């Protein structure tokens, strides 16, 4: 079973996070940031990854530290759960429509960290949530998983729909990339290591 758990405590946040890549049990997500909980629930459903998160952060300041630290911890758990990445597809991509918006994600579990984020989020806030934190979250995930992650909103009007399309596309692309393929012997690289 490919799984991992991490506890990350800083002067700003306390995060407990666990994942299971091969289980579709119900996820429990409580970050203290309602919009992030909603997006992580969508990610869990569409990636078919069991995700449990308990986060306490300095949300009286704003949600920045909590969102970023949850992304860091999720990335570290993904890296550990994937271990040597033997027999996984490695690459994944997905287009996801959400009403008038269309999101796209392509990723490579290459061991090299990179984020391309191309999304015009015209509404700077959704409730109390600063929409610029979406990019911060994905930056933290990509750099701590050590993946190439490309996210793009091709078009759309509603900022909530755009972000939702990105999280769903990320989940679906990640599921494709982490799926074990019996045709792949060892790691999916001519280098022999990822």
From Swiss-Prot:
It is an enzyme of class 4 (lyase). GO terms for biological process: L-histidine biosynthetic process. InterPro entries: IGPD_sf (IPR038494), ImidazoleglycerolP_deHydtase (IPR000807), ImidazoleglycerP_deHydtase_CS (IPR020565), Ribosomal_Su5_D2-typ_SF (IPR020568). Keywords: Amino-acid biosynthesis, Cytoplasm, Histidine biosynthesis, Lyase. This is Imidazoleglycerol-phosphate dehydratase. It comes from the Bacteria. Pathway: Amino-acid biosynthesis; L-histidine biosynthesis; L-histidine from 5-phospho-alpha-D-ribose 1-diphosphate: step 6/9. It catalyses: D-erythro-1-(imidazol-4-yl)glycerol 3-phosphate = 3-(imidazol-4-yl)-2-oxopropyl phosphate + H2O. Belongs to the imidazoleglycerol-phosphate dehydratase family. Its EC number is 4.2.1.19. The keyword Lipid metabolism does not apply.
